[in-house]
Amino acid sequence: MSDNIPNDPFADRESQNYENPIPSREFILEFLEQAGVPMNRNDLFEALKLAGEEQYEGLRRRLRAMERDGQLVFTRRQCYALPEKLEMVKGYVIGHKDGHGWVRPEGSVGKDDDILLPHHQMKNIIHGDFVLVQPTDNSKRGRREGRLVRVLEERNSQIVGRFFLEYGYSYVVPDDSRISQDILIPNEHKAGARMGNVVVIEITDRGSRSRGMMGKVVEVLGENMAPGMETQIAIRTHQIPYEWPEAVEKQIVNLGEEVPEEAKVGRVDLRELPLVTIDGEDARDFDDAVFCEKKKDGGWRLWVAIADVSYYVRPDSALDKEAINRGNSVYFPSQVVPMLPEVLSNGLCSLNPQVDRLCMVCEMTISESGKLSSYKHYEAVMNSHARLTYSKVSAILEGDEELRERYQPLVSHLEELHAMYKVLKEARDQRGAIEFETVETKFIFNAERKIESIEPVIRNDAHKIIEECMILANIASASLVEKAKEPALYRIHESPGELRLQGFRDFLSELGLELKGGLEPSPTDYADLARQIAGRQDQELIQTMLLRSMKQAVYNADNAGHFGLALKRYAHFTSPIRRYPDLLLHRAIKYLIAKEEGRNQDRWTPTGGYHYSFDDMDFYGEQCSMTERRADDATREVADWLKCEYMQDHVGDELEGVIANVTSFGFFVRLTDLHIDGLVHISTLANDYYQFDPIGQRLIGESFGNIYRLGDAVKVKVLAVNLDDKQIDFELVETSRKLRGEGKTAKKRAAEAKRKAKEKKRAATRSSSKESATARAVPAIEPTKRPEQTDSGRKRKGPKRGDDDSAKKPKVKKAHKKKPHSKPKKTKRTKQDAQ
C-alpha cells in the first residue's frame, strides 16, 4: 500500500472499494495542485509511491476516467494537468444554423462570456453537448474563440427531423436549426420511415473528420403537414418531458375523484364562503378562487384560495421528481403538456364548482387607499360557488340583466371586487408599476385542427381584477417567508443594464421622447414614459423596445425585488398546479404554520409542508428559470409555424401594417389586423444603397433619401412563406412617409447646394470690395482691431463643439447594399436576427 494513502482523506473509502487501493481522485487533484506543474503517468506513479503492476494499471484507469470526466487534461506532452491551470473552460454547446457555435461556461448567465467555436470545431459535436474548451488568442467581433479539447458529456436526448432518401442514401435533417449536421441513417435503421416523414432519431456514431454522423430512427411521427405535428416537433426538439414515468402512474392509480374525509380534518372550513373562480372560457385547471367583502370601518377583506397541491405531491415522491423535471405546464395553442397528471391538474387539485377541495388561503385586509394592511395564511377546505369567466364577470359589471339575475347572490361581491380593484389600480399607478397594454392573439381552429382565424385577446376589467388579487397574495406570501427568513424562491426582476438603457434612450431621443432618472431610472420614470406614449400610433412598438431594454424575470433564492411591478418583494404563490416555484412556496408556508403550532416533525409537516435549505433553493431557482425559458421558446416556435401556415393562403395579398423592427438587412412589418410579422428584405426595396442607423432605428437611402423607420405605417404584399424556416417575406407596396428629394439624387442636391454657396460667396466678395473702396475715402479715426478681438476688446471664442449641424447627426453603420436592378435574393434569417 502506498505511504501516501494514509494522507488521503478518502483512503477508507478506497480501501473498502478496492483490494489494492490507489489514491482517490480528490487526493490526485490536490497533489497536482500542490505540485504546480503537469506530470506524466510514470512521474505520478513514483511521486505517489505506488508499486506493482496492479497499482500501475489502477492509476492508469483512474487518470483516464478523470480525463474523460474533465477533471484532468492530457496535454500534447503526454502529461496530466488541471484544466483551470491551462485556462480551460467547461460549458454547454450552443449551435447556430450557419455551422459555427458557442460554448456557454458552466454557471454563466447570458451570452457575454460565450466562447466562439468555428465551423471546423463543430464537426463532431452538436447543440447541447457538455464540453471542455481552451480559449485561444483569436477573437471574432469582440468574442473569444476556443478550441475543443474534449466532449465531457454527449447530448443524450433524441433529435427530431425530416427523413430524406436521395441517390440510395437515407439521412435526416434536424428540425432544430441549432444542429446544422445532417445525420446519415443506414438501411437497417430506417424503421419504415418514408420520404418526407417526421422522425425521431438517436445518434449512434458521432463520425470523424472524414465521415459524418450516423443514427437510427426510433419513432416515425408521421407526415410533415399533419395537424398537430408542429407541437410534437417542438416538444421533442426542446426536450419537454411529455410521458409519465411508470413510478408516477403507480402513485396516482389509487387517487379517487373526491377529497378524502380525513384530509379535511383540522382545516378551516370555508365551504359556506361564496368563493368563485374567474378564468378564461377554455380553462380546464382552476388554481384560484376569490371572495371580497366591504369592511364596516372602511376598506375590504379579501380571501384568495389556492389549490392545495402540496397535500398530494409530497417531497421526494415520484410525482414530485417529475414535477421538478417539468418545472411548469406548457400551453401550446392546441395542446397542454401539464406539470401534473390530469387526475390532479383537472381533478383533485382543480377548484371545480360545487365540490369540496383542499386549499391554501391568504386572507388579507386592504385599506381604502389600496394598501395591504394585514394578512394571514392557513390551510382550509372550500367549495366553489360558481365557475365564472372573464367575459361573464365583465358583462355583469356592465349591467347585463340576464347574467345579473342568474348570479344574483354573487353580484354584490363582484361589485366589491371591482370597487377594490379601482383603488388598487390607483395605488399601483402611484408606486410607479410599469403597465403595458400589449395585444395578445389566439388561434381559432376548425374541426380539422387547421387555423380558421387569428383573433386578438380582449383584456377587460375582469382580467385585471384577478390580476390584482393574485399580485396581492403573492406580495403577502413573499413578505411572510422573508420576515421568517424561510428559504423560498422569489420572483425577481432586476433594473435594466447600462448598455441597453443607453440604447433605449438614444432611440427615444429620435422620437422626441425622454426617459428621466439618470443612470438609474426608477419604475416611476418608466411609468411616466408609458403615460407619454399613451395613444400614439407607435405606442405598441415603443413598448416593445422598452421590453427589449429590460432584463428577464427569473426565480432566485435571494430577494432582489421586482422592478417592473415596483415591489420590494414578490413571489409566486397562486398557481401550484402549473408552476413548481408556487408548490415550493406552499410547502415553506405550511412548514411555518406547523412550526408555530408545534405540529412540524423536524423538516416535515403532516400535510405536505417542508423546510428546505438555501442551497436547495439555488438549485430550484436555476431549474425553474430554465424550464420557463424552455416553455417560452417551444410555444413561440409553434406559434410562428402556425402563423406561417395561415399566411400560405394569403400569398399575393396586400395588407396594412407597421414597421415593427429595423435591422441592417431590412425591416419587419407587423400586420395591423393579424399581428403577424414578416420581413421586407433590403434587396426588395427601391434601387438604392441603404445605411442602417441603429440609434434612430431606420434605413436611410443614400441617393434618393428614402427613409424607412420604426413605427411607419406601410402597405405590403405577401411575397412568399417558408414553413421550414418559419419565415414570411413581404414586399413593400407603399409607405405613409413622404419620400424626400422630389426625385433629386443626393449628388444633384449636393451640387446645387455647392453652386448656391459659390454664388453667395461671389456676391459677398463684390459687396466687400465696394465697402473697402468707400472706407479708403474716409479718414481712419479708430484704432485697427486685432482679428481675434471683438468690439469689446475680448478674444472672440470659436464655435463650440457640436454647434455645427453635422456634429449632431447620429453615427450610422453601413448596411448591406443592393446593387441597382439586382434581383431579389432569398436569404435565411432566424428570430435572433430580429431581436
From Swiss-Prot:
Chief place of localization: cytoplasm
Please give the GO cellular component terms listed in this UniProt entry: cytosol
Q: Keywords in UniProt for this one? A: Cytoplasm, Exonuclease, Hydrolase, Nuclease, RNA-binding
Compositional bias of kind Basic and acidic residues: 739-754, 783-793
Domain RNB per the UniProt entry, residue ranges: 267-593
Q: Which PROSITE patterns match?
A: RIBONUCLEASE_II, S1
Q: Provide the top EC class.
A: hydrolase
> What EC number(s) are associated with this protein in UniProt?
3.1.13.1
The record's Pfam families line, in alphabetical order, gives: CSD2, HTH_12, OB_RNB, RNB, S1
The family this protein is said to belong to: Belongs to the RNR ribonuclease family. RNase R subfamily.
The name of this protein is Ribonuclease R
- Organism whose genome encodes this protein: Vibrio parahaemolyticus serotype O3:K6 (strain RIMD 2210633)
Q: Which gene encodes it?
A: rnr
